[in-house]
């Protein structure tokens, strides 16, 4: 047991955190009625004894009105007693983007934890802009793509997704371009990371 971080057992209990995160992610009772966290998985833990514990959670969230569900990743850091509020206040001064689900920044005082909703991140300040660019393939000029495959090709479709995310450390996105050369009825896929 870490006397500086007595909340460790709770923040590593996915069922307890599913309920705690549900209350913290959605501000209003109507939003909590509309969205349910169906599953909470821990995808990463980094622990510094007597100092802090970083935990990343993957949530499966369902909109009960539409039946649609989606994934939201939260990366949080638990602090010794009394240290989460100053960290939350400091993080609140940064420009944050609205995530797909819930609030961009969450403070859970009952477990002395501050969480950032992906694509917001405590250390990677440019991640929101970078992940938006990866998902919005219109930011990659077709001429750039075509310069790499030669003349006569056309971009017919693009798909992007985040392939790997390690909170406070790295994020890798993949973009695939579907290409066609109509003169030879040839297709090709170009993938970049």
Model regions: which residues?
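Phosphate/pyrophosphate-binding loops and the adjoining catalytic core of nucleotide-dependent enzymes
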Residues: 1-193
């Amino acid at each position: 047991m870490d006397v500086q971080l007595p909340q460790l057992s709770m923040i590593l209990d996915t069922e307890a955190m599913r309920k705690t995160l549900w209350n913290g992610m959605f501000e209003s009772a109507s939003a909590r009625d509309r969205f349910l966290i169906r599953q909470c998985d821990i995808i990463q833990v980094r622990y510094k004894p007597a100092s802090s514990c970083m935990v990343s959670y993957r949530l499966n969230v369902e909109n009960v009105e539409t039946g649609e569900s989606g994934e939201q990743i939260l990366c949080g850091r638990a602090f010794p007693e009394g240290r989460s509020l100053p960290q939350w206040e400091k993080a609140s001064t940064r420009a944050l983007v609205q995530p797909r689900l819930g609030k961009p920044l969450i403070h859970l005082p009952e477990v002395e934890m501050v969480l950032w909703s992906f694509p917001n991140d405590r250390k990677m300040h440019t991640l929101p802009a970078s992940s938006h660019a990866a998902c919005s393939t219109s930011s990659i000029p077709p001429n750039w793509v075509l310069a790499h495959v030669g003349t006569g090709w056309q971009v017919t479709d693009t798909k992007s997704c985040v392939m790997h995310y390690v909170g406070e450390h790295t994020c890798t996105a993949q973009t695939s371009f579907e290409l066609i050369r109509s003169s030879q009825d040839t297709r090709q896929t170009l993938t970049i990371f």
